[in-house]
Swiss-Prot record:
Residues 160-187 form a coiled coil. Its main location: nucleus. The keyword tRNA processing does not apply. It is found in: Nucleus. This is Mediator of RNA polymerase II transcription subunit 17. Pfam families: Med17. The lineage of its organism: Eukaryota, Fungi, Dikarya, Ascomycota, Pezizomycotina. Keywords: Activator, Coiled coil, Nucleus, Transcription, Transcription regulation. The gene is srb4. GO terms for cellular component: core mediator complex; mediator complex.
Length: 639
C-alpha cells in the first residue's frame, strides 16, 4: 500500500480566497471534518477550543526558539542550493515518470493504430522495441454478488430518473420561455407592421444593424434636425413596442404667436394638437415626436432669420422673437409647452380681437417651412454646382420676411385707404365730384401661377414676391388725376414700404412728385398738396372770364392763382379793390379764407385775424346743408 502512494513535493502556495465559500459548502466541510451537528455539545466544543489554544502556544514557542538561532549567510546559501537541487531532481523524476507512462501507452496502442502511436513514442523506445510488441487483453472480472448487482441497478435507475426529471424540468422551462418569447415577438412584429401600414418609413439604424427604426422626421430639413428624425423601435419584455426618440424631448412643444396692441395682448394662437386619436399609442407617440421636432425646427429657423433682420426692428431674446408691425402693434413668437397653463396666462390677455390674425400667422409660418423643405428637395434633385473650397452657406428660410411684408403692407394699405376716404369725404361734402379706386394687392395675379409646379407652391410664390397695391383717383379739373402705388419688399434692399405717386396736372405740368416716399405722413402731405393745387386750378378755371356766360357771372370777379403752392388766389375788381383767397386742405377739413388786401399786402402769406373783410368757411366730412365750394366762391366773387 505504501508503494501505491504518490507524493509530489512541489505544493502550491495557499492563497486566501477573495470570496468566502458559500454556506452550503462550509456546512458540508464541517460535516466531513467534525461530523454531524447532532454530536456537537458544549463540552466537546470547550475541549476543542482548549486543544487549539495549547497547539497555538506550542507552535509559538517553537517559532520563538527557531528565531533565536539564526543561521549565518553561508549556511543559508548552502541550504538554498540544496533545496534547489532537490526541486530539480523531483521535477526530473516526475518528467521521466510521465515519459515512461507515455511510452507505455504508445506501445500499447501501437498494436491497433501504429501511425498515431508512433508520433508520441520516444526515440529510444523506437530503437529497442518494434511496434505492436505489447498487447492487452480483457479478462473476465470476478463475479459480483446479487446484492451488489441489485444495488448497482437501483443506483443506476435512480440516477437515470433524476436525470430524466432534471431534463424534463429544463425542457418545460425552455418551452415556457420559448412560448413567451414567441408571443412577445409576435406582438412586436404586429405592432411594427401596424406602424408600416400607417405609411411610416421603416429602416435599420445606421450603427445598429439589428435594430429597426422609424423615420418620422423630414429628410429636407437642416442636418441638425434631419438626423434627429429617426427613432429606434425597441421591444419590451412583454413585446410592447417602445419608441426610443433619442434627442427629441418627451414633452410636446409648439410655436405660439401672440399679437400685442398698445402694450396689451389682444390675440393668441391656439395650441397645436397632434392628430392622433390615442396619444398613448405608438402612432400617437410617433406623431408627437414628429410634431415636436417640426416645431423645434420652425422656431430654430425663425431665430436664425431674426438674427439677420435686426436692422428692420426684429429683436430676439432667450426664447422669444418679436417684431413690430406698426407703432402700436407687435407680433411675438415663442416656443412653449401647449399643456401648461402658462400658454395663455403668461401675460395679461384682455382682448381676443386678434385671435384670428394670430392663428393665421401660426398656420402661415408652418406652410412657409413646408415650402422651404420642398425647395430644398428641388435643389437637391438638380445638378450640383461646381466644387469650391469655400463652404456653401445655407441661406435662411423666408419665414418672418413674408409675414412682416404682408402685415406692414396691409397696415399701409388700410391707412392709405382710410386717408383717401377722409380726404375725398371732405371734398364730397364741399360739393366736388371726384372719386378714387383702390386695388389692394394688385401684384398678386392668380391667373399667372406657374403650372409646372403644384398649386400650393405657385400660390406661395405669388406672396413671396414684392407686394404692391394701387390707388387711382380723379381730381376736379378735366384730365387731372393721380395714382399712388404702395410697394413693400423685405427680401432685397430697399427694405420696407415705398410710396410712388404718378401725377397728371395739365395746369401745372412742371409739378413732379418725389420718386420714392418712405413715410406715409410724407405721402399724405404730398397727396393733400396735389389735391389743393387742383382745387386752386378749379377755382381759377371756374371764375375765368372765358367761362363767365351768365349775367350773374359777368358781374363777378375772376380769381388768379398767385401762389398756387400756398393755395393763394388774387382778384382785382374794376375799381381797383383787391381780394385774396386762401385754400387750406387737410385730412379732416377744407377751409376757404377771403379777405381784402391793400398795396403790398397782396404778397403776404397769411391773413391776420384783424384783416378787414375776412370771411372763412369750412367743410368737414359728412352730410351738410352748407353751400358747395363753387357756390361759396361765386358768392364771394360778387363785385
Amino acid at each position: 500500500m505504501a508503494d501505491d502512494r504518490f507524493t509530489l513535493p512541489l505544493r502550491p502556495l495557499i492563497e486566501k480566497r477573495d470570496r468566502p465559500d458559500p454556506l452550503p459548502l462550509e456546512i458540508a466541510q464541517i460535516n466531513a471534518q467534525w461530523g454531524s451537528f447532532r454530536d456537537v455539545s458544549e463540552e466537546s466544543l470547550r475541549a476543542k477550543i482548549e486543544e487549539e489554544k495549547s497547539k497555538e502556544y506550542t507552535i509559538e514557542e517553537e517559532e520563538g526558539e527557531g528565531a533565536g538561532a539564526e543561521l549565518d549567510t553561508t549556511e543559508r546559501l548552502d541550504q538554498l542550493y540544496k533545496r534547489r537541487a532537490e526541486i530539480i531532481q523531483f521535477a526530473m523524476q516526475a518528467h521521466m515518470e510521465a515519459m515512461f507512462a507515455l511510452d507505455f501507452v504508445s506501445m500499447l496502442l501501437s498494436k491497433h493504430t501504429p501511425r498515431q502511436a508512433e508520433t508520441s513514442m520516444s526515440a529510444y523506445l523506437k530503437q529497442v522495441a518494434p511496434l505492436g510488441s505489447l498487447h492487452s487483453e480483457i479478462i473476465n472480472p470476478p463475479p459480483k454478488s446479487e446484492a451488489v448487482v441489485r444495488d448497482t441497478k437501483t443506483v443506476s435507475r435512480g440516477w437515470r430518473l433524476q436525470s430524466f426529471n432534471a431534463a424534463a424540468d429544463k425542457l418545460l422551462k425552455s418551452a415556457s420561455r420559448l412560448e413567451n418569447e414567441v408571443a412577445s415577438e409576435t406582438r412586436y412584429w404586429h405592432e411594427v407592421l401596424a406602424v408600416k401600414d400607417k405609411g411610416w418609413k421603416l429602416c435599420r439604424l445606421p450603427r445598429q444593424g439589428q435594430t429597426l427604426g422609424v423615420q418620422y422626421g423630414f429628410l429636407e430639413a437642416t442636418p441638425i434636425f434631419r438626423d434627429r428624425g429617426l427613432a429606434a423601435l425597441r421591444r419590451s419584455e412583454d413585446g410592447t413596442l417602445i419608441l426610443d426618440k433619442g434627442l427629441v424631448p418627451t414633452k410636446a412643444k409648439t410655436v405660439r404667436v401672440r399679437v400685442k396692441d398698445c402694450g396689451i395682448i389682444t390675440g393668441c394662437s391656439k395650441p397645436y394638437r397632434s392628430a392622433a386619436q390615442d396619444p398613448d399609442s405608438i402612432e400617437g407617440r410617433i406623431l408627437q415626436a414628429r410634431d415636436t421636432l417640426y416645431e423645434e425646427e420652425l422656431f430654430h429657423e425663425l431665430f436664425r432669420e431674426a438674427r439677420i433682420m435686426g436692422s428692420q426692428g426684429v429683436t430676439t431674446r432667450q426664447n422669444l422673437v418679436q417684431f413690430p408691425v406698426s407703432e402700436e402693434q407687435e407680433i411675438l413668437l415663442d416656443l412653449v409647452d401647449p399643456d401648461q397653463e402658462v400658454y395663455v396666462d403668461d401675460e395679461a390677455t384682455k382682448s381676443e380681437e386678434h385671435n384670428v390674425l394670430a392663428d393665421a400667422l401660426a398656420h402661415l409660418i408652418r406652410i412657409l417651412l413646408c415650402y422651404a423643405h420642398r425647395q430644398n428637395l428641388r435643389r437637391r434633385t438638380q445638378p450640383p454646382p461646381a466644387l469650391s473650397p469655400k463652404r456653401r452657406h445655407i441661406p435662411e428660410y423666408q419665414l418672418l420676411r413674408p409675414i412682416m411684408a404682408y402685415l406692414q403692407h396691409s397696415f399701409h394699405v388700410r391707412w392709405l385707404e382710410t386717408f383717401m376716404k377722409d380726404v375725398y369725404g371732405v371734398l364730397q361734402s364741399a360739393g366736388l365730384s371726384c372719386s378714387f379706386t383702390a386695388t389692394p394687392y394688385s401684384s398678386v395675379n392668380l391667373s399667372n401661377i406657374d403650372r409646372s409646379v403644384p398649386k400650393v407652391e405657385g400660390l406661395i410664390r405669388q406672396f413671396l414676391l414684392p407686394l404692391e397695391s394701387t390707388f387711382s383717383a380723379d381730381l376736379l379739373t378735366p384730365q387731372s388725376s393721380f395714382k399712388v402705388k404702395s410697394r413693400t419688399n423685405l427680401s432685397v434692399p430697399p427694405f420696407g414700404t415705398q410710396f410712388e405717386i404718378l401725377l397728371n396736372l395739365p395746369h401745372y405740368p412742371d409739378v413732379h412728385p418725389p420718386h420714392r416716399i418712405g413715410l406715409h405722413d410724407q405721402a399724405a402731405n404730398i397727396i393733400t398738396h396735389f389735391i389743393m393745387l387742383d382745387i386752386v386750378a378749379a377755382i381759377e378755371l371756374q371764375t375765368s372770364p372765358a367761362l363767365s356766360i351768365s349775367k350773374t357771372e359777368a358781374k363777378s370777379v375772376s380769381w388768379e392763382a398767385t401762389y398756387p403752392h400756398h393755395g393763394e388766389l388774387l382778384s382785382v375788381s374794376i375799381d381797383g379793390k383787391q381780394k385774396k383767397m386762401k385754400v387750406i386742405l387737410s385730412r379732416d377739413e377744407l377751409t376757404i379764407q377771403t379777405y381784402d388786401v391793400l398795396g403790398l399786402e397782396r404778397y403776404s402769406r397769411a391773413a391776420p385775424e384783424t384783416t378787414p373783410g375776412l370771411q372763412t368757411h369750412t367743410w368737414k366730412a359728412g352730410p351738410t346743408t352748407a353751400p358747395s365750394l363753387m357756390e361759396y366762391v361765386a358768392a364771394v366773387s360778387q363785385r
